UniProtKB/Swiss-Prot annotation:
Belongs to the RbfA family. InterPro entries: KH_dom-like_a/b (IPR015946), RbfA (IPR000238), RbfA_dom_sf (IPR023799), Ribosome-bd_factorA_CS (IPR020053). It is found in: Cytoplasm. The gene is rbfA. The lineage of its organism: Bacteria, Bacillati, Bacillota, Bacilli, Lactobacillales. Monomer. Binds 30S ribosomal subunits, but not 50S ribosomal subunits or 70S ribosomes. One of several proteins that assist in the late maturation steps of the functional core of the 30S ribosomal subunit. Associates with free 30S ribosomal subunits (but not with 30S subunits that are part of 70S ribosomes or polysomes). Required for efficient processing of 16S rRNA. May interact with the 5'-terminal helix region of 16S rRNA. It comes from Ligilactobacillus salivarius (strain UCC118). It holds the Pfam family RBFA. This is Ribosome-binding factor A.
Amino acid sequence: MAQHFRVGRLSQEIQREVNDILLKRVRDPRVKDVTITGVEVSGDLQHATIYYSILSDKASDEKKVQTGLDKATSLIRGELGHRLSIYVTPEIKFERDKSVQYGDHINELLRKLHSTDKF
């Protein structure tokens, strides 16, 4: 039970710190408009998946952002090691958060359904 709370606290702390690191330390223009939406940490605290969203829907922008984040991973992990008070800094992996796109898709479907009901 205590481990579950620790994982949750660590996830929140990693999310807060990675947002700060992206704003203040990473100078890569490819990652300037990235928002960290969530973090999943494994039960053994060895791996963390960091979910992000971007404002653009272009596939080319998504690829550029992913490349920029992959290049900055070692810097971000090093900074996390200095900022977090844990024994081992988790290995981090960035993944695009598709929930925002999915929510937009559902809203569009509901709008279409609502507009067809009026006729």
